[in-house]
């Protein structure tokens, strides 16, 4: 398996769990997925689509990641924990993009034309985020874990939620910015609401006993 220096460098820069380049080349699943995509993409561009799709199938079978060989991906592409990553045929991804596990860059149309997202440079897409349709995500954008993005996002924005909404743009908070490890959790929010209701009921019962 061949590894591009820029993709390997991205692993070393972005994944603190990797202690050496040798370790990354042997065991880093995301790097392996990117390498297999690069090989398949070259074959796809050369018109050897059957060979490209075979590599894609092998990659999906081994890793759980499905990056169509027709997708266009720039340099220094980093996938952390590749399982569940899906990138469609007409997706375009810029340079220095970070994708976490379970991310989907999908289509919402059955047409043969451009139907998947275009992602700019220096973008971070959090765990389980879904970006759908022929939309454009600008440069320097952060998409929070679990977000569902269905519309264009301008440069220098932070997006969270379902549907995805901009909470920060060009350094100005529109809502409270949330980090990758501090994003909305609907289940946890419901639990906290129930706890508050229980506490209130306890207070009412205590007052009745007096």
Question: What do these predicted regions represent?
Answer:
Residues 1-63, 174-210:
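Terminal amphipathic alpha-helical/low-complexity segments used for targeting or macromolecular assembly
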Residues 60-167:
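Structural signal for interior beta-strand "rungs" in well-ordered beta-sheet cores
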């Amino acid at each position: 398996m061949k590894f591009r220096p820029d993709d390997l460098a991205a692993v070393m820069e972005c994944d603190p769990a990797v202690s050496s380049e040798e370790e990354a080349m042997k065991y880093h699943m995301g790097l392996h997925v990117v390498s297999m995509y690069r090989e398949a993409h070259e074959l796809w561009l050369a018109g050897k689509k059957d060979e490209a799709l075979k590599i894609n199938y092998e990659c999906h079978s081994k890793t759980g990641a499905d990056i169509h060989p027709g997708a266009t991906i720039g340099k220094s592409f980093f996938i952390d924990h590749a399982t569940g990553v899906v990138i469609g045929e007409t997706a375009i991804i810029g340079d220095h993009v970070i994708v976490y596990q379970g991310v989907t860059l999908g289509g919402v149309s059955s047409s043969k034309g451009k139907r998947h997202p275009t992602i700019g440079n220096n973008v971070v897409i959090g765990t389980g985020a879904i970006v759908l349709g022929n939309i454009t995500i600008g440069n320097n954008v952060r998409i929070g874990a679990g977000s569902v993005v269905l519309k264009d996002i301008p440069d220098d924005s932070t997006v969270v939620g379902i549907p995805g909404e901009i909470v920060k743009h060009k350094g100005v908070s529109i809502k409270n910015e949330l980090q990758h490890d501090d994003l909305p959790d609907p289940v946890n929010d419901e639990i906290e609401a129930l706890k508050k209701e229980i506490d209130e009921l306890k207070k009412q019962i205590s007052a009745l006993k007096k």
